[in-house]
Every structure is written in C-alpha cells, then in structure tokens.
UniProtKB/Swiss-Prot annotation:
Residues reported in the UniProt entry to bind [4Fe-4S] cluster: 349, 409, 412
Known EC number: 4.2.1.33
The record's free-text note on cofactor binding: Binds 1 [4Fe-4S] cluster per subunit.
NCBIfam families the record matches: leuC, PRK05478.1, PRK12466.1
Family: Belongs to the aconitase/IPM isomerase family. LeuC type 1 subfamily.
Enzyme class: lyase
Protein name: 3-isopropylmalate dehydratase large subunit
HAMAP family for the chain: LeuC_type1 (MF_01026)
Gene Ontology terms, MF aspect: 3-isopropylmalate dehydratase activity; 4 iron, 4 sulfur cluster binding; metal ion binding
Function, as annotated: Catalyzes the isomerization between 2-isopropylmalate and 3-isopropylmalate, via the formation of 2-isopropylmaleate.
Pfam families: Aconitase (PF00330)
Organism: Aliivibrio salmonicida (strain LFI1238) (Vibrio salmonicida (strain LFI1238))
Gene from which the chain derives: leuC
Length: 471
C-alpha cells in the first residue's frame, strides 16, 4: 500500500498528539487567534475551573468584529460591542494573552493581522472562533474555525479533538485572462461546486492559476473555502510564500528561517497521493463574477443573464433560486448591469489587504462615486491603512468621493454601525451574501475590489473589462 500523502494529511499527521483506538484523534494546535465575539464565555470557563491559558505565547487576540470604523471610541458601536471589547481587554490582561486592541498599531481583522505579522506560518495548525480561519491555509497550514466551547478547550490545553476529513483537490488549470482576480477565481469555483459541494472535505487548491497568485490572492481563495462547505482550504507553500514570510515580526530569522524553509518545502502533496474528490476548472474561461442570490454558489459571470429558476434541474436549487430572486429583487433573464447599487463595500477578511486597496484605487483614480451611492473603503488592519496612506491611496479615494475608514470587519456583517438598510443593494468584496448578513433585508452581491469600485462610480454593476479596455 502506498504511503503517499496529500498536503493536508502531512500537516494533520504531524500534529496528532493522541490517537487512542476508537477515539477521535487529539491534535496539537500551533496558533490560536482570538477576537472579542467568540471568546468571553471561553475565558469564563477557564476562570470557573481554575485553569490558565496553556500557551500564552501561541495565543494572539485583537478587536475586529464590532469595532467602529469611524472612531476609536469603544462606545461607538453600542452597549453589547463595548461590553465585548472591554471583556476581551480584561481577559487578556488577566490571563497574559497578547492583545492588539483598538489603539494598537497592529490592530486589525484577525485574518489580516495573523499573516502580516508572521504569526501564520506553513505547516501549522491554526484555529480561531471564526468561520473564515481557512484564510491562513494559503500558507500551507491547516486552519479552521471553531466554536466557543472549543476555544475554551484550546486555551486550556493547546489541543483539540479533530476527526480526519475527506480530501478534495480543486485544480484551476492554465492562466486567467487580463483583469481576472483571485476573487473571481474562487467565486467561479464555488459556482461550480455549489455552496455545499465541499461539505466534509478539506480542499487543496492547485494549478497554474493558483500558483500564479500572490500570497494576498491566495488568502482570498482560501478565505472562501468555507463558502463551498469545506472544513479548510490549503495551498502548498512555495517561493512566493517564503518571500512573503521573510522579515515579518514573528517570522523565523537567519539560520532558523533557512531550516524552516527546508521543512516547509516538503509540505506538498506527493505525486501518487489519492484525493477523495477532484474538481477542475479552466482558468481561461473565468470571467468577472457577481453573485445574484443568497449564497455564494448562486453566482454568474457579469455578462451572463440572471438565471431562471426553471433552468435548475435540482428541485431544491429551483426553490432556492425562486426565493433568492424574490429576496434580491431581481428578474430572471435581465442583466445585473441593469441594477443600480446603493452602497459599495471594499473590505473584509476576504479583500482588505494592500493589493485589494490598490486595485480599487486604480479604478477610482480620476473618477467620482455616483451621486446616489455611499462607498466605503475599509482597510483590513492598521498596517494596511498606514501603507495605503503612505502610497497616497486614501487621497485618491477621498477625491473620488469614497469614504476612507478605520480598520475592522465593518459592513461584512451587521455587528457594528456599517450596515445596509432594508432593500438596499450592495456591491461587496466580502464573503457571504446570506439574507440579512449585511443588515436586515439588505441585498448583497459579492464581487472583486475592482468590480466594486467600478460599480460605485457607474452607480450600477459594470463589466470591469470594458473599463480596462478603454484605459
């Protein structure tokens, strides 16, 4: 029998601490990222049982979900938000956990902060009480979201019971055409697999179109692995990964880095390893993507008509499409370019890094936001914000009529003051278009940063390729 392993199996096997017969294996956890929303009860549990945080040096906290993006005032997002942030401060102080709070230069969205500081490294197991923890899989680490009781377990033991998942390979063959981004690639993938196609699997993304991506692009792809139902998404580390890691705050240095890279280079799927499922896409066929429905799998290319419910053979999908069109206020057969947007949001753990901000700024430069549109640019961290301002991108946005905000999760989820009103339509670079996700009865369309910025200027959805062709 072959001993060949997939990347996921290599990382998983390297972290099995206890594997008792008939029991779910216990994995050692290398990094635990913490935020204000899913941690209060976990710390309470430690207190009740008289336990400490087992590995404070491997635990990092920040405030992101309900922070205001207009002020550093802790009271700005309401009573619940204030209590959660104050509680996180007290808990981190009491238990000795590193916290990047509202006024810290490293504060930011947890999945932006980890990689940019070198906290995230290849071959690690990484958990966080947040479903988009898969983002860190871009480094060839096994990263996934956990619930609050599991947060407590990891704080107390630095381990977690975790069953072995099935494996899926998603290969994006060839090169993408001009103007196609990581967001378009991952939305096209989810359009093919559906929002449940990856359930029960850990996915490895590969192929030329994936390895061509920068680390920030790879993070966008892995961030949305959860949106096809997968437990986690990984990309094998390579020279692009090692270059990104080098010189960051918590990255290994000197001989330690050389030794680490030698090990990290072994973190790839063996040639004769078998996957439980394989999905492939032709990169050259991927066009700019826009979601039309209420899950990320309900997505089309910008030049395709909105699908009719009767075009779906699966009765469940048909009913889902009918409900989605009614909720979204869309008519089958029409083009998404026929619909005006009310708000535009560039941000979230999917698309708030410096390359995303640059892409939006390139479209915004010399243009003006349509009169009826409110457009928000929300950098993913203080570090991203500082870099963007150093490059003068904030000036470009302000001159074009965009709002330049402070870092946070912002309009991705209605847990702070940035939200949609009923029936407001939003072009959003976030990762979820569920009913009410951005505000009660709000209508979310997921797009790339360039597509979002273009919609802000036109006042409706446009094909970014028509703009870049003119330029």
């Amino acid at each position: 029998m072959s001993n060949a392993k997939t990347l996921y199996e290599k990382v998983y096997d390297a972290h099995v601490a206890v594997a008792a017969k008939g029991e779910t294996p216990i994995l050692y956890i290398d990094r635990h990222l913490v935020h204000e929303v899913t941690s209060p009860q976990a710390f309470d549990g430690l207190r009740e049982k008289g336990r400490n945080v087992r590995q404070v040096g491997k635990t990092f906290a920040t405030m992101d979900h309900n922070v205001s993006t207009q002020t550093k005032d802790i009271n700005a997002s309401g009573e619940m938000a204030r209590i959660q942030m104050e509680t996180l401060s007290k808990n981190c102080e009491e238990f000795g956990v590193t916290l990047y709070d509202l006024n810290h230069k490293y504060q930011g969205i947890v999945h932006v902060m980890g990689p940019e500081l070198g906290i995230t490294l290849p071959g690690m197991t990484i958990v966080c009480g947040d479903s988009h923890t898969a983002t860190h899989g871009a480094f060839g680490s096994l990263a996934f979201g956990i619930g609050t009781s599991e947060v407590e377990h990891v704080l107390a033991t630095q381990t977690l019971k975790q069953a072995r998942a099935k494996t899926m390979k998603i290969e994006v063959k060839g090169k993408v055409t001009e103007g196609i981004t990581a967001k378009d690639i991952v939305l096209a993938i989810i359009g093919k697999t559906t929002a449940a196609g990856g359930t029960g699997y850990v996915v490895e993304f590969c192929g030329e179109a994936i390895t061509d991506l920068t680390m920030e692009g790879r993070m966008t792809v892995c961030n949305m692995a959860i949106e096809l139902g997968a437990k986690a998404g990984l990309i094998a580390p390579d020279a692009t990964t090692f270059d990104y890691i080098t010189g960051r705050k918590f990255s290994p240095q000197g001989e330690d880095l050389t030794a680490a890279i030698e090990y990290w280079s072994s973190l790839k799927t063996d040639d004769d390893a078998k996957f439980d499922a394989v999905v492939s896409l032709d990169a050259s066929e991927i066009k700019p993507q826009v979601t039309w429905g209420t899950n990320p799998g309900q997505v089309i290319a910008i030049d395709q008509p909105i699908p009719a419910p009767e075009s779906f053979s699966d009765p469940v999908e048909k009913v889902s499409a009918e409900k989605a069109l009614a909720y979204m206020g869309l008519e089958a057969g029409k083009s998404l370019t026929d619909y005006n947007v009310d708000k535009v949001f560039v941000g979230s753990c999917t698309n708030s890094r410096i390359e995303d901000i640059r892409a939006a700024a390139a479209v915004a430069k010399g243009n003006k936001v349509a009169a009826h549109v409110q457009a928000l640019i929300v950098p993913g961290s203080e570090q991203v914000k500082a870099q963007a301002e150093k490059e003068g991108l904030d000036i470009i946005f302000k001159e074009a009529g965009f709002e330049w905000r402070l870092p946070g999760c912002s309009m991705c989820l209605a847990m702070n003051n940035d939200r949609l009103g009923p029936q407001e339509r939003c072009a959003s670079t976030s990762n979820r278009n569920f009913e009410g996700r951005q505000g009660r009865d709000g209508r979310t369309h997921l797009v790339s940063p360039a597509m979002a910025a273009a919609a802000a200027i036109a006042g409706h959805f446009v094909d970014i390729r028509t703009i870049t062709e003119k330029a």
